[in-house]
Amino acid sequence: MALNTLGSHYKPNKITNRKLNRGDIYLVDSGGQYEFGTTDVTRTISLQNSNKRIKDIFTRVLKGHIAVAGYKLKKNTSGSKIDNEARKYLKQIGLDYAHGTGHGVGFFLNVHEGPHAISKNNKVKFKEGMIVSNEPGYYEKNNFGIRIENLIYVKKNKQKNYFENLTMAPIDKELINQNILNDSEKKWLNNYHKKVFHNLKGVMNKVEISELREACSAI
């Protein structure tokens, strides 16, 4: 099931190419270089997948993603302090992932660029304006892979720093086990999807807006 999602960055070739089938999950990591900046986004998409374990793990990855997005930044907060927040819900059931939770983003240079990052050993303190990815995941050998990635940046408001989302893309609700999310996490997801719909509807036609409205509907 979804074997090509196992690596953190899969590259298609003639040997590993395969058709997508009902029941698969599809991981797409995308982005581009633009005059205003560099983008990086990952979504895991359900193709009518009903596997309870996959949904449970996806939801724990989402909980970690939300924990990073809502992390209360203090004066000396570094990526090493935040990294454990992203992993703790997976660790509760004995799971983890081998890559860092987030990387700095270059501009027409490297997509992965420091000095800051959200990782176990990064001690660089976050400052206003820094952009970093928020991408916890999970990869199970010979089975499947999951990742949710947004770009976020450090914003200052009344002497306090906090993370603000730059990425506007729906998170697949079909893969969520709502019983694992608490009320605060559900509220975060609903508020995020409201922003996604508001920001994207203006560049879409009627059919696309209808699909977007469903993807961004409240849970």
Q: What label would you give each PLM region?
A:
Residues 1-219:
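Active-site neighborhoods and metal-handling regions in enzymes and metal-associated proteins
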